[in-house]
Design a protein with these regions (language model features):
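Catalytic alpha-helical scaffold of carbohydrate-active enzymes acting on polysaccharides/glycoconjugates
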Residues: 1-124
Length: 124
C-alpha cells in the first residue's frame, strides 16, 4: 500500500530544509583542520586558519543572505553565541528576514562534554 502525504503545500512530495552553520572560534584559535597542507611548528600561530575561520562572519553569512533573499527561502542558522557578539548586525538582519536562529554553543572550540558541571553552567 502506498502511503500518501497530502499535507505539503500544493500536494508536493518533497521538502528541503536549509541549515547554515555560522560558527566562530575563541580569539586566536582556529579550526582543528586547516587549508594549510604543511603542519606548522608548535607555537606558531595559524594565521591562515584563523583568517579562514573568520570568513563566515565577515563575508560568508552575507553571501548566504543574498542567496536566500534572491530565492525567497528561509533557513535555520545555527550560530555560536560568540558569533552573535562579534557580528550582531548579521544576526539582526537574519532575524529581521525571518530566518530561524538556533543556539550552537558559545564557540566551536568549547566542547561541553570536556567541562566540569560547574564550567558547563558558567558557559550556559
Amino acid at each position: 500500500m502506498e502511503k500518501s502525504i497530502s499535507n505539503w503545500p500544493d500536494g508536493r512530495k518533497l521538502t528541503v530544509m536549509v541549515t547554515i552553520m555560522f560558527e566562530v572560534w575563541s580569539e586566536g584559535k582556529a579550526p582543528p583542520y586547516s587549508p594549510m597542507t604543511t603542519s606548522l611548528k608548535s607555537g606558531t600561530p595559524d594565521l591562515l586558519g584563523i583568517s579562514w575561520s573568520q570568513y563566515g562572519g565577515k563575508t560568508g553569512i552575507w553571501r548566504f543572505m543574498r542567496i536566500l533573499d534572491d530565492t525567497d527561502i528561509n533557513a535555520t542558522v545555527c550560530l555560536n553565541a560568540k558569533a552573535a557578539e562579534l557580528f550582531p548586525d548579521a544576526v539582526k538582519r537574519l532575524h529581521a528576514r525571518g530566518h530561524e536562529i538556533a543556539g550552537h554553543s558559545y564557540t566551536q572550540d568549547l566542547v561541553l562534554p570536556y567541562l566540569t558541571l560547574e564550567e558547563e553552567k558558567d558557559v550556559i
